[in-house]
A protein has these predicted regions:
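Compact, glycine/acidic-enriched structural inserts
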Residues: 107-168
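Short connector loops/turns at beta-strand edges and beta->alpha or beta->beta junctions
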Residues: 18, 108-110, 190
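Aromatic- and glycine-enriched beta-alpha-beta binding-site module
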Residues: 74-134
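Charge-rich, acidic-biased intrinsically disordered regions
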Residues: 49-75, 227-242
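Long, solvent-exposed, polar/charged low-complexity segments
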Residues: 1-15, 44, 145-146, 153-257
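Soluble extramembrane domains of integral membrane proteins
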Residues: 56, 60-96, 100, 142-160
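Active-site acidic/histidine clusters and adjacent loop/turn architecture
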Residues: 14-69
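Amphipathic alpha-helical coiled-coil segments
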Residues: 32, 36, 40, 126-129, ...
Length: 257
């Protein structure tokens, strides 16, 4: 597939970064639709056909995957109203959109980030994942040391505890994974890479390599949700909420959502 992004995509995002203003954007929204949002929707449609071949558990649908350009500034010191990148995430079909691990793509004025994982999971999710890692660390190790994973994204990384998590011994064979508070794997490129003929093939290669990690991370969260769905009482016809939201995020240096 030829990349749907073009030099006009990057030119628009760079101009938006210099003019992060609602009035400026309103006057140029047709160009945004043509050169930024439209190409991403085209990409998501193609991924909707290709993703099920290796990640049938994940969603690629513009109604779910595409992030809005407008920022929520209510609790932020940064009052810039608009995001200066275009991004999409590919969450689990078995979890709410804002929960769990997924794949992620971002095209920004100076960079492209392709990868996935779990950026800022709530502590309840971290505990579930740690228990899953402790019981299945060999499976995780096989994923993140596999040839396709290492060649595509290098290593599993993220913020981690300086010591041993509560409830685990210091000589646990999976300690390096148990200390993680984030679970991230991805690769960064120059922004212009998004416009090349190699872009889509590389996107698929990285997504294919990271998808087993996403599936591993989501397994305990899906099981937990199924378990509480069976036991939680109904209130006004709806299940009581069980967890705070978590969502896929790129490394801190990669984006400001």
């Amino acid at each position: 597939m030829t990349s749907p992004f073009s030099r006009k995509t990057l030119a628009y995002l760079r101009a938006l970064k210099r003019n992060n203003d609602r009035n400026w954007f309103k006057l140029r929204k047709p160009q945004y639709e043509e050169h930024v949002r439209g190409p991403m929707v085209t990409l998501l449609a193609q991924l909707g056909a290709d993703l099920p071949r290796f990640a049938p558990d994940l969603i690629s649908d513009p109604r779910v995957s595409l992030y809005r350009i407008y920022r929520d500034t209510r609790f932020s010191h940064d009052k810039a109203p608009l995001k200066t990148h275009v991004a999409a995430h590919f969450p689990s079909k078995d979890l709410p959109r804002k929960e769990g691990a997924g794949l992620y793509l971002e095209v920004a004025p100076t960079r492209v980030w392709i990868g996935g994982g779990l950026y800022m999971p709530p502590s309840a999710d971290v505990r579930l994942i740690r228990a899953h890692v402790a019981a299945n660390h060999r499976a995780l190790h096989r994923i993140v040391t596999g040839t396709s994973f290492r060649r595509a994204v290098g290593t599993l990384h993220g913020d981690r505890l300086s010591g041993t998590p509560r409830g685990y011994v210091k000589d646990h064979p999976a300690l390096e994974y148990l200390r993680l508070k984030q679970f991230l794997a991805g690769r960064e490129f120059e922004a212009e890479f998004a416009t090349t003929n190699r872009f889509y093939a590389e996107l698929l290669r990285i997504f294919r390599a990271v998808a087993p990690l996403v599936r591993f991370l989501n397994a305990p969260l899906i099981e937990h949700r199924r378990r509480i769905t069976r036991i939680l009482p109904l209130q006004d016809g709806a299940l009581l909420p069980d967890r705070r939201r978590s969502e896929v995020r790129p490394p801190a240096a990669a984006s400001r959502w």
